[in-house]
């Protein structure tokens, strides 16, 4: 293995760049729909050796000394994000005449920007680089910090954080309840990088042993949480809500077509909602439709509310995604919100919640005046774009069920599970992944949603237009669901309700403690204070 390490360390020029990009791209096999987490062992082993060879002239300034390492990290990240996010281009092809020109920006431009975070992670690690296991601790700390920054800088976009590669199944998700997805990311990089120590021998015994212990603890805690830890007491049989998830699989082009029969789309949802339970099951208490499932402004269409009332029984509730319009007075443009409505059996809207975290260039246009003059517009055609709600609040349903609402990609942000979530007993995620067709995107989105359930300790009710719709318990296990591309409905019983984790602060604290510990290991190793590390 030392010979292989030497060859990688010494590779130069175009071959070096190609190897870095390839290592990043190969790591994507650890993500859904593949879930081959072992791929990241090879990718990060190669990355460590490439960083070992990222030398600069001693006479160079700080930036000059760190530039080769930054370049390696950027190339690795570029390969990772191109291979992991290429499917974003599918959304632009829904209206190809209008947006096909932006394909290079989505497929290459966004990955190039996101790769900067990985370049900075490697450059930061290079500052603490040593010959022993300290270098993989430094790399883990660098990636943990930069993945966290990626989730908060500008509007944030933490999609496909490295840690998800170490969480393909519920057994391997449970650590996120303690240290969060970003904490798992830091530990994952340490574990995935450990085989690189065999290539240089120094610190191999200590470093690999620690990595094995961390991986064993990761699995051990997962087994404890799934099979040994106490679970919430099940609700009495007659108190268990039955939730119907409606998945109409409406083609996105049809949803955007102004000439489409919107009533037909609406009736498709009503028909699936009205069908009798299968196998003699209980009728649903709660019926859920996906994001923007109501194809018109509901408050302007009393006939639609009447049709909903005709479909529902008096004791049933409909939760549906819709566009909400808010009149702001004479001479002021109408504001539009991506919203969730709760409608009772009489056709009355009894609760609503608006989306807080909007998708840039999809739901609103940054620097709108400038970009509009250049002919650039939102992918979603709403006059003036969507407005963001100032805050998120619970949807309190009759019977004491409090849902924490998250629309579309809001569920990928770990640090946004705040505020009223302490009073929630389930997460609600409405989305429309039909934008991305039969690509890896919806599978990646679903994994991140399941990890949010684990982090918060709350069951997840997720409804998607084209899939994946599912009821997920607080351990990330799928209770019932509909796969990508299926049309129909599924009735699922919520057996128990969780009180959750209270807030994100314990996880954030443990994440920063993990970062501090990794940096301490890197510093100690660099100074040679512990035998066998250098």
From Swiss-Prot:
Q: Which UniProt keywords apply?
A: Acyltransferase, Cell inner membrane, Cell membrane, Membrane, Transferase, Transmembrane, Transmembrane helix
Q: Which residues cross the membrane?
A: 8-28, 31-51, 69-89, 105-125, 127-147, 178-198, 208-228, 511-531
InterPro entries, per the entry = Apolipo_AcylTrfase, C-N_Hydrolase, C-N_Hydrolase_sf, LNT_N
Under the heading PROSITE patterns, the entry gives:
CN_HYDROLASE
Q: Name one GO cellular component term.
A: plasma membrane
Manganese recorded as keyword: no
Any Pfam family from its record, for instance, is CN_hydrolase
Q: How does it sit in the membrane?
A: Multi-pass membrane protein
Listed GO molecular functions? N-acyltransferase activity
**Name of this protein:** Apolipoprotein N-acyltransferase
Species in which this protein is naturally found: Rhizobium etli (strain CIAT 652)
């Amino acid at each position: 293995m030392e010979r292989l390490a030497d060859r990688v360390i010494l590779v130069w020029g175009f071959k070096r760049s190609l190897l870095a990009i390839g290592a990043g791209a190969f790591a994507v096999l650890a993500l859904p729909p593949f879930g081959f987490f072992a791929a990241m062992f090879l990718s990060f082993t190669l990355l460590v050796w490439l960083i070992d060879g990222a030398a600069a002239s001693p006479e160079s300034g700080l930036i000059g000394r760190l530039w080769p390492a930054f370049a390696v990290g950027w190339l690795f990240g570029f390969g990772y994000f191109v291979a992991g996010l290429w499917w974003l281009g599918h959304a632009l092809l829904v209206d190809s005449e209008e947006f096909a020109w932006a394909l290079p920006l989505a497929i290459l431009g966004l990955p190039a920007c996101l790769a900067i975070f990985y370049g900075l992670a490697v450059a930061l690690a290079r500052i603490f680089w040593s010959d022993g296991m300290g270098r993989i601790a430094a790399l883990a700390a660098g990636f943990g910090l930069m993945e966290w920054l990626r989730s908060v800088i500008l509007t944030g976009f933490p999609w496909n954080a490295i840690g998800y590669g170490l969480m393909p199944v519920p057994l391997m998700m449970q650590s996120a309840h303690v240290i969060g997805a970003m904490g798992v990311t830091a530990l994952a990089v340490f574990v995935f990088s450990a085989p690189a120590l065999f290539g240089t021998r120094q610190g191999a015994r200590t470093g690999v042993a620690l990595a094995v212990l961390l991986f064993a603890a990761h699995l051990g805690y997962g087994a404890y949480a799934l099979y040994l830890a106490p679970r919430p007491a099940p609700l009495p049989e007659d108190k268990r809500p039955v939730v119907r998830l409606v998945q109409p699989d409406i083609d996105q082009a049809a949803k955007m077509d102004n000439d489409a029969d919107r009533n037909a789309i609406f009736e498709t949802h009503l028909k699936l909602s009205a069908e009798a339970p299968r196998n003699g099951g209980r009728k649903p208490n709660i019926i859920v439709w996906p994001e923007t499932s109501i194809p018109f402004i509901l408050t302007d269409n009393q006939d639609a509310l009447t049709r909903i009332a005709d479909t529902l029984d008096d004791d049933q509730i409909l939760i549906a995604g819709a566009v909400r319009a808010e009149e702001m007075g004479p001479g002021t443009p109408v504001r539009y919100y991506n919203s969730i409505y709760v409608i009772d059996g009489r056709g009355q809207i009894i609760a609503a919640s608006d989306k807080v975290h909007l998708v840039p260039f999809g739901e609103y246009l940054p620097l709108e005046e400038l970009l509009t003059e250049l002919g650039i517009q939102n992918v979603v055609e709403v006059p003036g774009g969507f407005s963001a709600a100032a805050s998120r609040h619970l949807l309190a349903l009759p019977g004491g069920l409090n849902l924490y609402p998250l629309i579309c990609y809001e569920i990928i942000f770990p640090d946004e599970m705040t505020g009223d979530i302490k009073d929630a007993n389930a997460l609600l995620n409405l989305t429309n992944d039909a934008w991305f067709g039969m690509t890896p995107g919806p599978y990646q989105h679903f994994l991140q949603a399941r990890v949010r359930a684990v982090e918060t300790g709350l069951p997840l009710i997720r409804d998607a237009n084209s899939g994946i719709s599912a009821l997920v318990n607080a351990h990330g296990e799928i209770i019932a669901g509909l796969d990508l591309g299926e049309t129909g409905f599924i009735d699922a019983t919520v057996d128990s309700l969780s009180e959750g984790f209270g807030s994100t602060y314990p996880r954030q604290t443990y994440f920063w403690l993990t970062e501090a510990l990794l940096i301490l290991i890197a510093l100690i190793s660099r100074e040679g204070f512990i035998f066998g590390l250098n």
